[in-house]
Amino acid sequence: AAQAVAVAKANAKIQGEAVLLAPQKGYGEVSWKTPIEINAFEVPVKEKVDLLLNVNDVAMQNGASFVNSAIFAVNEQKYFASTDGSYIDQDVHRIYPTFNVTRIDRTSGQFKTRNSLSSPMGKGYEYMHARPEDKVSGIVTRYKGRYDMLEDVKEAAKVASEKIKAKSVEPGKYDLVLDPSHLWLTIHESVGHPTELDRVLGYEANYAGTSFLTLDKWKSKNFKFGSDKVNLVADKTQVGSLGAVGYDDEGVKCKKWDLIKDGVLVNYQTIRDQAHIIGEKESQGCCYAQGWDDVQFQRMPNVSLQPGKTKLSVDDMIKNVEKGIYIIGDGSFSIDQQRYNFQFGGQIFYEIKQGKIVGMLN
């Protein structure tokens, strides 16, 4: 604490302008906890190890040449106190089961992989106990709410073998149908990071640069980010999500707000010393610190594309596609230093012809 005060005093000597913190009321003694059913740290290590060994065994039985698997679990216990009068106790849980399956064709020397289609979640170990309603059926089974690791790895091993035999895509122009397991990374990199106000202002340029969503575009109130059907929201309150907490690391209560509304850029992500720059009276609660001994700074909340008015299946989405590719899972990616031009790979690719999936592509 004494060192922090000394650093602050030293920085003040070369400060160009005063730091303006958005007002923040004190909440007194409050607490927040990730709503979980099973604490992953109370599950015996043997039970987790046995599950992973079973995952590996199922993969090998279904054609995998190599497989590795893991379950990452985090329990962050955080206490925040401020001179605003907030004393906030938070108990945050996160979990992420994952695997990577490789299939080698020793005759041709080709090899293909498929990773898990799980998601890191703000949940307890109940995430590992999938129910029928948690499964989204289709050409590949996907999951919501909970995850079946054994079922997914069995399918993954078979898909890796299919990928070796799949034909190469022919160069040309295609309509793309993007599965949520793929689209999340596109949203994260081309919407989430570009709407971080510190990147917009040039304060942050680490790991793929600043932002093309400059203040003049926001001030115009008519910058078209996408079609009228595109609505993207920031939300740190979504139950079960990876980014959900009760309060950020400046003691700001978390909330939900619009970033893109009817295809138009309407807002950014802010913390307390940025809010006044865009005329906001309060922070949007986007401040994170890695630990008590690190300076907190801006980091995106959950950023999500909102569903349309009509519920659609994959078949509904592809039925009018004459020539397209349906992409499942995330792969390699690259993006320019303003996050404007980008490419995102996938894991599984299916060719669409005349509204039907006709086969797998490489």
Regions found by a protein language model. Give the residues of each.
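N-terminal small-residue-enriched
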Residues: 1-362
